[in-house]
Regions:
Chain A
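Enzymes that bind and transform nitrogen-containing heteroaromatic metabolites
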Residues: 1-212
Length: 212, 212
């Protein structure tokens, strides 16, 4: 049976996955440079994986792509626009050949036509309920697992609903002060989870949550 | 010159130092057993220190008592009562011989007479401003450092005011979901701090914040 997994979601020491006021010229929100600092471990680990190196960060990063057949994300992760689409020229942050290579379901109150990209990535835009979208993603994954890509609000919704099987998050050694907290507004959903791993590399701390 | 230090403050993975509704029969607030779970590393490390053992947790724990000449705490850390003192029979959580053995300054809107305990601990109750209380504590420390003992609200106030030199906190691998967040409401105070250490033992992750 397909698992629902979250991987490589980076938060600051004070718990923020993104700052306030995300927008096109500041995809992680207000503040200079901290979006880069927050994800610097990710960039370094990506280079390590590409070079065939192993290590705590590279191993955790690579795990996130293994056996994933479909991805679900929030509209804010797909793009910086809010409200109705002014036009449909925006095709995501990732260029013509996005690094998914499978079906990606984008939760949005403003659906638009399905978008087929090079390399096998197809973006589906939907305002259906979580369970319906997850069902479609499981079908699309065809026996592989489904990844919830983010952002924080979407992960919270799936966690609160108890729909996530494994959540890997990464604590970066920095303070942001304000923005969007990942582990917040979880209600009783969190009672079903326990920490199964906590390990620190020279750069960050990796934490895994799994069902009790 | 005296430093102002915070040590061994334990927070959950989701950032809480205490739950909601702290009271006499639930000093860490609502919820069964998690106060014990949050601090289980502390109990084990205390036993290790007493037995002369070393290790990541024991070493961090012991550091918190080194070269400390005075302690500052909030009234909620001194006791579970709120509002005016019904009587003054409460003498803290720690019995007749508290583990401080120096002057302890308790921030409270409801001052009461100074309380001399066995073993050299003297509790002073004050509604003076942070800077005044810190000045008194520095004098009392007589060349040694001053420790801010807690709870979360008092640590936040000193951090926001930029008055803390070193902050050692401990992340326990558990979720609490609601309560009092330590790294919250810090305003621009946090801009003066950086993470100087992050290390994980088999039990917890230790993090140190210092001035930039």
């Amino acid at each position: 049976m397909s698992k629902v997994r979250v991987h490589n979601v980076t938060i600051s020491l004070d718990g923020f996955a993104a700052g306030a006021n995300q927008r096109l010229d500041a995809p992680f929100g207000d503040g200079v440079g901290w979006g880069d600092e927050l994800h610097s471990w990710f960039v370094a680990a990506t280079e390590d994986v590409a070079a065939g190196k192993t290590g705590i960060d590279a191993d955790h990063l690579a795990r996130g792509d293994r056996n994933i057949g479909a991805t679900i994300m929030g509209r804010n992760m797909f793009g910086p626009q809010r409200g109705p689409w002014a036009d449909e020229s925006w095709k995501g942050w990732w260029g013509d050949n996005p690094p998914y290579h499978h079906d990606v379901f984008v939760h949005t109150h403003h659906p638009r036509p399905t978008l087929e990209m090079a390399g096998g990535t197809t973006f589906h835009f939907t305002d259906e309920p979580l369970e319906t979208v997850l069902g479609r993603a499981v079908d699309a994954a065809d026996g592989q697992d489904v990844r919830i890509g983010g952002g924080a609000a979407v992960i919270q919704q799936y966690l609160r609903a108890g729909l996530i099987d494994e959540l890997h998050l990464v604590i970066a050694p920095m303070l942001i002060g304000r923005g969007e907290r990942l582990l917040d507004n979880l209600g009783d959903g969190i009672d079903g989870y326990r920490v199964s791993e906590m390990v620190t590399s020279p750069a960050v701390t990796h934490v895994a949550l799994v069902r009790r």
